[in-house]
A protein has these predicted regions:
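Long, leucine- and charge-enriched amphipathic alpha-helices
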Residues: 83-120
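Structural signal for interior beta-strand "rungs" in well-ordered beta-sheet cores
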Residues: 1-84
């Protein structure tokens, strides 16, 4: 754990990990073995990092991000699995629309089926 890094409560750091200087690991972060966390990286609450992953210097992972692969330096990622923040935000916005979209697709499928029956 590098000089100046802050480790909050209930953080688990696996074997053979390296946490750079001035990194911040917020509550309930879990880091699997052999990971590299760059200097000044921020892992918000409940972030989970798979084994042998590298988090670049200054990268930010928002709360509850699931990290299966390397994160480039200086980027902000979120989601499960994690992805660049702009993409994660679009997915989160679309999730709210899914119930209405499913209803609409079902209605359209019924109408299409009815039209195909009439045509036959």
């Amino acid at each position: 754990i590098g000089r100046g890094s802050k480790v909050d409560n209930l953080v688990q750091v696996g074997h053979n990990c390296d946490v750079g200087e001035d990194a911040i690991l917020v509550a309930q972060v879990g880091i699997s073995g052999s990971c590299r966390i760059g200097s000044r990286a921020i892992l918000a609450g409940q972030v989970g990092v798979a084994d042998h992953v590298t988090i670049g210097e200054g990268a930010i992972l928002v709360a509850q991000a699931g990290v299966p692969s390397d994160i480039p330096a200086g980027e902000v990622w979120g989601g499960m699995p994690s992805r660049p923040m702009a993409e994660a935000r679009r997915i989160w916005a679309a999730e709210r629309l899914l119930p209405a979209l499913v209803r609409r697709v079902r209605t359209l499928e019924k109408r299409l089926e009815e039209l195909e029956r009439r045509r036959a």
